[in-house]
Design a protein with these regions (language model features):
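Acidic, low-complexity intrinsically disordered segments
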Residues: 45-108
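Short, charged/polar N-terminal "headpieces" of proteins
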Residues: 1-46
Length: 108
């Protein structure tokens, strides 16, 4: 199959967020992120600036994030800024994004 370079370089990918719970276990929750594909140079540059700048560049949407009352939290820069203070959430998002690179390496 031929490689087709697409103008719109986004993709949806599942994100697992593992948070510590009582009893020495982790609770895992999942949501779907919409990521923007970055070029290697842009990714490397943003990686040195910090998690929030990287998140702002790669995460452009989500589905499946609710508040405590079960209401969906729509994606926004304000919501992203709030979530970026949660180290478990940030780890889940960045792990999911970088995992796509690993899959590309393994398959090629």
């Amino acid at each position: 199959m031929a490689f087709v370079r697409k103008k719109i370089r986004t993709f949806k990918w599942p994100v697992n967020v593992e948070e510590p719970a009582d009893g020495g276990v982790f609770d895992t929750s999942t949501f779907d992120a919409t990521f923007k594909r970055l070029g290697r140079a842009e990714f490397a540059k943003l990686s040195t600036k910090g998690d929030y700048d990287l998140l702002k560049a790669v995460l452009i949407g989500w589905d499946g994030i609710d508040d405590e009352d079960g209401k969906p939290i729509p994606f926004s820069i304000e919501a992203l800024k709030e979530f970026s203070d949660d180290s478990y959430w940030v780890r889940g998002v960045l792990t999911a994004y970088t995992k796509t690179f690993e899959g590309a390496r393994e398959g090629n």
